[in-house]
UniProtKB/Swiss-Prot annotation:
Heme b b562 binds at residues 83, 182. It comes from Ochotona thibetana (Moupin pika). It is a multi-pass membrane protein. The lineage of its organism: Eukaryota, Metazoa, Chordata, Craniata, Vertebrata. This is Cytochrome b. Its cofactor is heme b.
Length: 379
């Protein structure tokens, strides 16, 4: 009798995706982040569903409903903090996943890469709208500042902003629609993940050497299922440590003050995972220029396959490119730090320099160094 996992129409799909999937024998722990992102998405959807059962998307009761979840709902506090800190874990895994893609040249699978960029935009949009929901000071002012950026779009800007707000300012209509979008987007993300995996399984996984590994494949189960399980254990341990020992470490104290349109906080800043993009936005004095730079800071990933000039796919054997990659990482950390600082000297000039270096590295330095490395191969 044929094994059910190989004959049943539904089990066959699961089998080809998670059990008998041929995987390269040499993929390192850097390949764990895909499954960890799946775990994060699962945690966020489940905790979010339970939070939505008690949350009210009304300006008068939103803040107190979050307080009610933490104080009166059974284990509401842990659900709320798992959701808030789960978002941070999600972005840590996302950044490491994208970083691994850049380092090992995974962007040459352009369909998978482009769906990944769409996923990144969708997750960022979801996180932004989720941050508005508790209706604290930073929620309200963050929503006001970021949505207001759309007014920089010529001709339609002002109308577009008022259309998104549902009025002439961030108010009840804005909060209600943000809640609706925040609820539906994770399911759209889950669908995009399926497409992401569909394209990935068309080509098979990349590996650290960047060399085609068809001659040396091993089954995904048990080798990589056990490896992923260890990753899950690490992630859950880290998340629970954060939630149970310092749940507010990554949050903003201003968000424990109910939203007040008449009182602007001294420093309006987004969550830590948006600070690098926020720093790029602030580094350009022109409003429209800043908005374009903000969008391009992520959209620039889409041109990476076009800028790949090296004869080798991975950076594993390209020391000059490796140095530039780590300069890029340091630059992004600098931008993250700058994004959380007030707009004053010397932070303004540091932010402008770091923003320039970010685009200069990706668009000019890295492709040029790849060409130099091609020449060095002939020596």
């Amino acid at each position: 009798m044929t094994n059910i996992r190989k004959s049943h129409p539904l089990m066959k799909i699961v089998n080809h995706s998670l059990i008998d999937l041929p995987a390269p024998s040499n993929i390192s722990a850097w390949w764990n982040f895909g499954s960890l992102l799946g775990l994060c998405l699962g945690i966020q959807i489940i905790t979010g569903l339970f939070l939505a059962m008690h949350y009210t998307s009304d300006t008068l009761t939103a803040f107190s409903s979050v307080t009610h979840i933490c104080r009166d709902v059974n284990y509401g506090w842990i659900i709320r903090y798992l959701h808030a800190n789960g978002a941070s874990m999600f972005f840590i895994c996302l950044f490491l996943h994208v970083g691994r893609g850049i380092y090992y040249g995974s962007y040459t699978y352009s369909e998978t890469w482009n769906i990944g960029i769409l996923l990144l935009f969708a997750v960022m949009a979801t996180a932004f709208m989720g941050y508005v929901l508790p209706w604290g000071q930073m929620s309200f002012w963050g929503a006001t500042v970021i949505t207001n950026l759309l007014s920089a779009i010529p001709y339609i800007g002002t109308d577009l902003v008022q259309w998104i707000w549902g009025g002439f300012s961030v108010d009840k209509a804005t909060l209600t629609r943000f809640f609706a979008f925040h609820f539906i987007l994770p399911f759209i993300i889950a669908a995009l993940v399926m497409v992401h995996l569909l394209f990935l399984h068309e080509t098979g996984s990349n590996n650290p050497t960047g060399i085609i590994s068809d001659a040396d494949k091993i089954p995904f189960h048990p080798y990589y299922t056990i490896k992923d399980a260890l990753g899950f254990l690490f992630l859950i341990t880290l998340l629970l440590t954060l939630v149970l020992f310092s749940p507010d470490l990554l949050g903003d104290p201003d968000n424990y003050t109910p939203a007040n349109p008449l009182n602007t906080p001294p420093h309006i800043k987004p969550e830590w995972y948006f600070l690098f993009a926020y720093a790029i936005l602030r580094s350009i004095p022109n409003k429209l220029g800043g908005v374009l730079a903000l969008v391009l800071s992520i959209a620039i990933l889409a041109v990476m396959p076009l800028l790949h000039t090296s004869k080798q796919r991975s950076m594993m054997f390209r020391p000059i490119s490796q140095c530039l990659f780590w300069v890029l990482v340091a630059d992004l950390l600098t931008l993250t730090w700058i994004g959380g600082q007030p707009v004053e000297h010397p932070f303004i000039i540091i932010g402008q320099l770091a923003s320039f270096i970010y685009f200069f590295l990706i668009l000019i330095l890295m492709p040029t160094c790849s060409l130099i490395e091609n020449k060095l191969l002939k020596w």
